[in-house]
C-alpha cells in the first residue's frame, strides 16, 4: 500500500511533546480543542459538545447526596447494632444467630454501596464528540488502515456472515489503495476460506455498484434482505427513499436486480460448501493445523481505474472507480499441546503478519458478524487520530484507540435480555470519554498500531524517543523489526513478504518474547479486550468514544436466554481473571498516568461478579423464614430505618432519571438493564466466581462456549414474528438457570406463604410499626420477582404471553396450599 501521506506515528518531534509529566492525560476540553485549531483556516476535525450543564450539575449533586445518605445510614447501623440485635433476639432468634445475620447484612449493604459508588463516579464528567468527515474529502490526507476480521468456528459463526462483513469493508468509503482487510480463520476451516474467496470474486461487482449508486448499508445481506421491520433493522432504507445518489432511478432498479441475482448465486455456493462436507473440510483440525497466508486481492494503486461501459460486468461501470482494497486470508499455525491464547493469540498473529505486508499505522478490529453499516465510519474514526494543520495532516498524538458502540440487528423489539446494552455504551462509555476515554470492548475499535506495540504516548517519551525494536521483546524476525521502526506504511505482497508473514503466524514465534504481556493483545483472560485497553490507559494513552449516525457498525446478538447467559458468563469470568492477574486495577502501576476515576471504572469492571454472592443471599435468606413460618422478620423496622430506606430509593430514582436525561437512553431501556442485571447476577456471575475460584486454586484454565452468531435477516418479517424471533422462544435448559429459578420460586412461594399466614393484611395491624413489619418482607419479595420477570418469560418459551396468569395462578395455588396446611396444623395442635 502507498505511504500514508507522510503521517508519522512512531516518533514525534520534541516540540510536540509537553515537558510536564506529573499527571495523567485527561480528555481534551472544548476550550482546549478550540485552541488546538487556532491558526488553522479550517474547522477542527473533532468538536466536543457540552451536555446540558444544569442536568449534569443536578446529576452530580444527587450522587453526592446519596453518598452522604449512605455514610449516615451505615453510621446509624453500626451505632445501634446492639439495639438491633436485641430487638431481633426478642423476636425469637438467638443472640449469636442475630449477630451473624446482622453482620452478613451489613457486609452485603456495604458491598452494594461500594459497587454503586464505583459505577457512578466515573460517569460524572460525560462529553459528547462530533466529527467533520467532510474536512477529509482530500484522500491524500488519509493514512493507510488495516482492518482485522476474526472468526473461530464456522459452526457458530456462519461463513456467509463473514463474507458479508468482508464485503462491507471492501465497499467502505475509504480510498481503496489505503485499506487492507485481513481475515483471521482460527479454525483453519476450508469452508471459511471458500466463503472469503467467494466474497473476493463478488466484490468486483458489489463494490463498484455501491460506489456508483451510493447505497447504504454496504453489507449485501442487510441491503437486500433487511427491509423495514426486518432482521436488518430497516437499514435498507436507501432503496425506497432517502439518499439515492445514482444517475437515474430506473438504472438503480435494473442494476440492483442484477447484483442481487449474483449475490443469491454466491450465497448458494457458500451454502453448498457447508452442505458438501458436514465435517468442515479443514487444513488439519481446529486446534492442529498449519499456518496459511494467502493474498486474495492485491493492493490497488493510487490512480483511479475506471470501469467499462459495456455489459461485461452486468452493470454499466463507466466513470466508476473499480479498484478494490487488498484482501488477505490468514490462518495461524496451531498445534496440540501449545497454548494458542484464543482470540488474543489470533489478533497478535494478524498484527505481526500485517506489519510485513502493509504496516498501516491504524488498525480497525471487527468481529466476523459486525459489518460496516455507515460507509463513512472509517473516516470518522481517523478524525480522532489526526489533526488538520495548514494544508496537511499531523498525528493527533496520545489517542490509542477509538471505540464505537455496538449496535445489533435481529434483537426482539422488547429487548428482553438487554442485548443493546445502551446503559453501558451510551452512559458508562460516554461518561468515561470525559476522563481518559472509554473501555475497549472487543469489536468496532480503531487502534493506533504503535500503541499496540506497548510504546508510551508522546507526552511520556523522552524527547525524540521512538520505538525500540528489541528482538527480546518483539521476536527475531528482521523484516518485522524493520516494520516496527518504520514511520510509514508500505505495500509488499511478493513471495518473500508472504513467506515472512507465514513465519510470523507460526505457533513458536512468540516463545521467549513479550507478546501477550507487554506487546499486543493481553493473554491470560478470555476478556482480552478489557485487559488490553487497561494496559494502554495505564501507560498514559487516551481513548475516544464516538456514536455515529447512522450506526458505524452493526452485528448480531444472542436473543436466546441460554446463549445470552453463556455470553455473560464468559465476560464475568474474564473480568475476574483480570482481577487476579498482574493487570489488577487496584494494584497495577501507572499512578501518575491513570486517572483515579478511570482506575475506579476498571476496578468496577473486574470485581462486579462478586456482587452475586451477596445478592443471592438477599434473594433467598429473607424469604425462607416466611415460608417456614419463622420470625426472622418479626422485628418492626424503626422510623429511622424507614426514613433512610425511603431516601435511598428516592435518590436512586432521581439518579436514574437524570442519567437517562443526559445520556439519551429511555427509562424503559434503563429498567430492562436493571432486570437483566438481576438475572445475570443470580446465574452467570455466580458460575463465574466458582470457575475463577477453581482456576486460582488449581491452576486449571477456563473453557468457554463461543457465542453462536446468526444472520439477522435470515428470517424475514413475512414469516411472522414467531419465526423471525424463534431463538427468543426456544427453551434450552442450562445449569446456569438453576440458581435464578430457585430464587424466583422461593420468593413467589414466600409471597404465598405470607398471604396464607395472614401477614399481607397489614391494614389490620395494631400499629404502624407492625404494619411496616408485615409489609416490608412482601415488598421485598415483589421487588425480586419483578426483576426476574424476563427470566420467567424465558422459561415459558412460546407460552410466555401466559406468564402473568400462570404466575398468578401459581401464587393462588401456593397460597391455598399453605393456608390449608396452616389450618391442619392449628387443628392438630388445638
From Swiss-Prot:
UniProt keyword list:
Cell wall biogenesis/degradation, Coiled coil, Glycosyltransferase, Golgi apparatus, Membrane, Transferase, Transmembrane, Transmembrane helix
> Which SUPFAM superfamilies does the entry link to?
Nucleotide-diphospho-sugar transferases
Q: Which GO terms describe its molecular function?
A: cellulose synthase (UDP-forming) activity
Question: Its function?
Answer: May catalyze both beta-1,3 and beta-1,4 glycosidic linkage on beta-D-glucan. Essential for (1,3;1,4)-beta-D-glucans synthesis in grasses and cereals (Poaceae). The mixed-linked glucans (which are not present in walls of dicotyledons or most other monocotyledonous plants) are particularly important constituents of the walls of the starchy endosperm and aleurone cells of cereal grains such as oats, wheat, rice and barley. They can account for up to 70% by weight of the wall.
Q: What class of enzyme is it?
A: transferase
Positions the record marks as coiled coil are 251-279
Gene name? CSLF7
Where are the bilayer-spanning segments? 61-81, 98-118, 613-633, 638-658, 676-696, 735-755, 776-796, 805-825
Question: Where does this protein hold substrate?
Answer: 367, 369
Q: Which GO cellular component does the record give, naming just one? A: Golgi membrane
Q: In which tissues is it expressed?
A: Expressed in mature pollen.
Q: Which PANTHER family match?
A: X-BOX TRANSCRIPTION FACTOR-RELATED
Which Cys residues form disulphide pairs?
none
**Recorded E.C. number(s)?**
2.4.1.-
Q: List the subcellular locations.
A: Golgi apparatus membrane
Major subcellular location class:
Golgi
A single GO BP: cell wall organization
| Entries under Gene3D superfamilies matching the protein | Spore Coat Polysaccharide Biosynthesis Protein SpsA, Chain A
Return the similarity comment.
Belongs to the glycosyltransferase 2 family. Plant cellulose synthase-like F subfamily.
Q: Which topology term describes how it sits in the membrane?
A: Multi-pass membrane protein
Q: What is this protein called?
A: Probable mixed-linked glucan synthase 7
Catalytic site positions: 186, 529
Amino acid at each position: 500500500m502507498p505511504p500514508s501521506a507522510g503521517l508519522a506515528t512512531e516518533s514525534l518531534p520534541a516540540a510536540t511533546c509537553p515537558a510536564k509529566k506529573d499527571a495523567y492525560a485527561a480528555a481534551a476540553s472544548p476550550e482546549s480543542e478550540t485552541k488546538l485549531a487556532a491558526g488553522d483556516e479550517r474547522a477542527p476535525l473533532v468538536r466536543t459538545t457540552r451536555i446540558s450543564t444544569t442536568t449534569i450539575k443536578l446529576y452530580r449533586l444527587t450522587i453526592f447526596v446519596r453518598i452522604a445518605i449512605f455514610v449516615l445510614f451505615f453510621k446509624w447501623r453500626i451505632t445501634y447494632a446492639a439495639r438491633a440485635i436485641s430487638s431481633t433476639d426478642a423476636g425469637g432468634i438467638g443472640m449469636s444467630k442475630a449477630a451473624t445475620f446482622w453482620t452478613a447484612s451489613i457486609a452485603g449493604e456495604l458491598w452494594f454501596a461500594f459497587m454503586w459508588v464505583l459505577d457512578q463516579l466515573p460517569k460524572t464528567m460525560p462529553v459528547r464528540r462530533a466529527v467533520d468527515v467532510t474536512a477529509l474529502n482530500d484522500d491524500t490526507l488519509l493514512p493507510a488502515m488495516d482492518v482485522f476480521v476474526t472468526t473461530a468456528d464456522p459452526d457458530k459463526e456462519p461463513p456467509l456472515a463473514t463474507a458479508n462483513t468482508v464485503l462491507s469493508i471492501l465497499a467502505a468509503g475509504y480510498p481503496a489503495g489505503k485499506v487492507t482487510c485481513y481475515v483471521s480463520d482460527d479454525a483453519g476451516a476450508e469452508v471459511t476460506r471458500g466463503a472469503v474467496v467467494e466474497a473476493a470474486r463478488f466484490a468486483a461487482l458489489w463494490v463498484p455498484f455501491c460506489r456508483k449508486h451510493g447505497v447504504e448499508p454496504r453489507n449485501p445481506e442487510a441491503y437486500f434482505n433487511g427491509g423495514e421491520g426486518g432482521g436488518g433493522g430497516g437499514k435498507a432504507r436507501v432503496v425506497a427513499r432517502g439518499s439515492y445518489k445514482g444517475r437515474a432511478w430506473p438504472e438503480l432498479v435494473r442494476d440492483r436486480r442484477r447484483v442481487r441475482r449474483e449475490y443469491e448465486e454466491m450465497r448458494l455456493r457458500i451454502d453448498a460448501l457447508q452442505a458438501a462436507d458436514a465435517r468442515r473440510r479443514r487444513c488439519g483440525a481446529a486446534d492442529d493445523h498449519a499456518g496459511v497466508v494467502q493474498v486474495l486481492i492485491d493492493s490497488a494503486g493510487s490512480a483511479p481505474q475506471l470501469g467499462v461501459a459495456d455489459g461485461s460486468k452486468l452493470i454499466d461501470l463507466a466513470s466508476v472507480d473499480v479498484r478494490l482494497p487488498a484482501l488477505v486470508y490468514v490462518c495461524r499455525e496451531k498445534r496440540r499441546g501449545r497454548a494458542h491464547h484464543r482470540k488474543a493469540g489470533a489478533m497478535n498473529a494478524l498484527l505481526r503478519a500485517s506489519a510485513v505486508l502493509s504496516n498501516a499505522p491504524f488498525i480497525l478490529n471487527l468481529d466476523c458478524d459486525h459489518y460496516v453499516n455507515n460507509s463513512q465510519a472509517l473516516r470518522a474514526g481517523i478524525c480522532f487520530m489526526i489533526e488538520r494543520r495548514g494544508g496537511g495532516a499531523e498525528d493527533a498524538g496520545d489517542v490509542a484507540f477509538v471505540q464505537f458502540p455496538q449496535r445489533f440487528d435481529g434483537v426482539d423489539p422488547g429487548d428482553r435480555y438487554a442485548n443493546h446494552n445502551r446503559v453501558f455504551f451510551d452512559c458508562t462509555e460516554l461518561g468515561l470519554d470525559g476522563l481518559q476515554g472509554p473501555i475497549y470492548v472487543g469489536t468496532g475499535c480503531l487502534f493506533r498500531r504503535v500503541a499496540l506495540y506497548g510504546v508510551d504516548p508522546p507526552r511520556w517519551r523522552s524527547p525524540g524517543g521512538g520505538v525500540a525494536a528489541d528482538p527480546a521483546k518483539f521476536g527475531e524476525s528482521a523484516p518485522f523489526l524493520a516494520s516496527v521502526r518504520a514511520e510509514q506504511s508500505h505495500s509488499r505482497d511478493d513471495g518473500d513478504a508472504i513467506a515472512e508473514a507465514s513465519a510470523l503466524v507460526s505457533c513458536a514465534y512468540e516463545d521467549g518474547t513479550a507478546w501477550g504481556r507487554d506487546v499486543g493483545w493481553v493473554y491470560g483472560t478470555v476478556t482480552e479486550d478489557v485487559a488490553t485497553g487497561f494496559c494502554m490507559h495505564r501507560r498514559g494513552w487516551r481513548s475516544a468514544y464516538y456514536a455515529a449516525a447512522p450506526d458505524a457498525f452493526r452485528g448480531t446478538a444472542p436473543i436466546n436466554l441460554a446463549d445470552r447467559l453463556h455470553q455473560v458468563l464468559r465476560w464475568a469470568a474474564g473480568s475476574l481473571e483480570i482481577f487476579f492477574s498482574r493487570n489488577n486495577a487496584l494494584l497495577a502501576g501507572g499512578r501518575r498516568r491513570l486517572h483515579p476515576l478511570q482506575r475506579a471504572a476498571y476496578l468496577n469492571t473486574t470485581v462486579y461478579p462478586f456482587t452475586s454472592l451477596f445478592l443471592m443471599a438477599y434473594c433467598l435468606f429473607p424469604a425462607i423464614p416466611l415460608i417456614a413460618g419463622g420470625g426472622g422478620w418479626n422485628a418492626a423496622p424503626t422510623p429511622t430505618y424507614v426514613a433512610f430506606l425511603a431516601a435511598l430509593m428516592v435518590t436512586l430514582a432521581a439518579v436514574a432519571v437524570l442519567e437517562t436525561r443526559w445520556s439519551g437512553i429511555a427509562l424503559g431501556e434503563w429498567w430492562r438493564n436493571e432486570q437483566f442485571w438481576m438475572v445475570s447476577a443470580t446465574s452467570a456471575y455466580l458460575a463465574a466466581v466458582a470457575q475463577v475460584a477453581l482456576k486460582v486454586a488449581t491452576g486449571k484454565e477456563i473453557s468457554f462456549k463461543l457465542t453462536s452468531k446468526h444472520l439477522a435477516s435470515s428470517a424475514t418479517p413475512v414469516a411472522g414474528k414467531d419465526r423471525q424471533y424463534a431463538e427468543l422462544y426456544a427453551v434450552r435448559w442450562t445449569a446456569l438457570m438453576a440458581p435464578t429459578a430457585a430464587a424466583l420460586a422461593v420468593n413467589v412461594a414466600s409471597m404465598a406463604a405470607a398471604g396464607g399466614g395472614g401477614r399481607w393484611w397489614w391494614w389490620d395491624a395494631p400499629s404502624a410499626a407492625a404494619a411496616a413489619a408485615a409489609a416490608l418482607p412482601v415488598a421485598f419479595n415483589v421487588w425480586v420477582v419483578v426483576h426476574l420477570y424476563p427470566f420467567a418469560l424465558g422459561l415459558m418459551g412460546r407460552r410466555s404471553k401466559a406468564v402473568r396468569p400462570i404466575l398468578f395462578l401459581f401464587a393462588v395455588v401456593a397460597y391455598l396450599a399453605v393456608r390449608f396446611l396452616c389450618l391442619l396444623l392449628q387443628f392438630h395442635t388445638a
